[in-house]
């Protein structure tokens, strides 16, 4: 089915919340199945014991929970985490996305904390803004 695996905007254009090209439509059943079966293959065949999802926020919560559940059926110690944000807007509603704001809805799926990273080392996009480890005052509470 043309366009099935990629998320599109209401006008039919492809969405690019990754800023790297088309984003996958993880909320569609066959795309979800493809993602789950792919990680299961890697876990079984290559004994991968952890999976990191770059820009996890482009994926929906249900898919990320399905990934973690399937992996934990193989081995409960397999670690799943990702970046809980996107690099652009997406037609998938925020309430359905695997964002940091929705981490409580992710069953055993962790989200990387850019807040702690930036508090410790300084803002990732502002090299002149030091973090706690470089002596910037007032950050002690943000890195606890």
Which stretches of residues belong to each language-model region?
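Substrate-binding/active-site clefts of carbohydrate-active enzymes
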Residues: 1-46, 60, 64-75, 79, ...
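Short catalytic-loop micro-motif centered on adjacent basic/acidic residues
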Residues: 50-56
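Acidic-and-aromatic substrate-binding clefts and catalytic sites of carbohydrate-active enzymes
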Residues: 56-62, 87
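Conserved alpha/beta catalytic core and glycan-binding cleft of carbohydrate-active enzymes
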Residues: 68-144
């Amino acid at each position: 089915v043309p366009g099935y695996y990629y998320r599109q905007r209401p006008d039919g254009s492809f969405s690019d919340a990754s800023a790297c090209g088309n984003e996958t439509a993880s909320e569609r059943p066959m795309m979800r199945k493809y993602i789950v079966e792919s990680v299961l293959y890697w876990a079984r065949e290559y004994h991968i014991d952890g999976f990191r999802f770059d820009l996890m926020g482009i994926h929906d919560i249900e898919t990320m929970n399905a990934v973690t559940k399937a992996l934990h059926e193989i081995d409960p110690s397999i670690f799943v985490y990702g970046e809980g944000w996107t690099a652009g807007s997406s037609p998938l509603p925020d309430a359905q996305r695997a964002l940091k704001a929705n981490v409580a809805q992710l069953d055993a799926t962790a989200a990387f904390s850019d807040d702690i990273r930036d508090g410790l080392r300084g803002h990732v996009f502002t090299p002149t803004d030091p973090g706690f480890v470089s002596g910037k005052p007032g950050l002690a509470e943000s890195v606890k």
